Amino acid sequence: MKLRPLHDRVVIRRSEEESKTAGGIVLPGSAAEKPNRGEIVAVGTGRILENGEVRALAVKVGDKVVFGPYSGSNTVKVDGEDLLVMAENEILAVIEG
């Protein structure tokens, strides 16, 4: 199954969770914080402006992004994988390099 987000929404595959702290302590799955990074796997057509024009999104498939800890509250399971669906304005930055 493939998701096609509408308008200014994007679908993100969350990065793998860290299971160790910086000090080397192994965290159980329930204590590990979910990462706020991921890769965009699908984008919508763009934001519809008040005048009816469509503004293309500033992100594209394959971009690695950072989002807020409470962003992407819409999680969808596709082919056994949890994907996040969020609006483009919930993305804080694109990771370059």
Swiss-Prot record:
The keyword Cytoplasm applies. Gene3D superfamilies: GroES chaperonin. Keywords: Chaperone, Cytoplasm. The keyword Magnesium does not apply. GO terms for molecular function: ATP binding; metal ion binding; protein folding chaperone; protein-folding chaperone binding; unfolded protein binding. InterPro entries: Chaperonin_GroES, Chaperonin_GroES_sf, Chaprnonin_Cpn10_CS, GroES-like_sf. CDD domains: cpn10. It holds the Pfam family Cpn10. One of its GO terms (cellular component) is cytoplasm. SUPFAM superfamilies: GroES-like. It is found in: Cytoplasm. Belongs to the GroES chaperonin family. Heptamer of 7 subunits arranged in a ring. Interacts with the chaperonin GroEL. PANTHER family: 10 KDA HEAT SHOCK PROTEIN (PTHR10772), CO-CHAPERONIN GROES (PTHR10772:SF58). Together with the chaperonin GroEL, plays an essential role in assisting protein folding. The GroEL-GroES system forms a nano-cage that allows encapsulation of the non-native substrate proteins and provides a physical environment optimized to promote and accelerate protein folding. GroES binds to the apical surface of the GroEL ring, thereby capping the opening of the GroEL channel. This is Co-chaperonin GroES. It comes from Pseudomonas putida (Arthrobacter siderocapsulatus). The lineage of its organism: Bacteria, Pseudomonadati, Pseudomonadota, Gammaproteobacteria, Pseudomonadales.
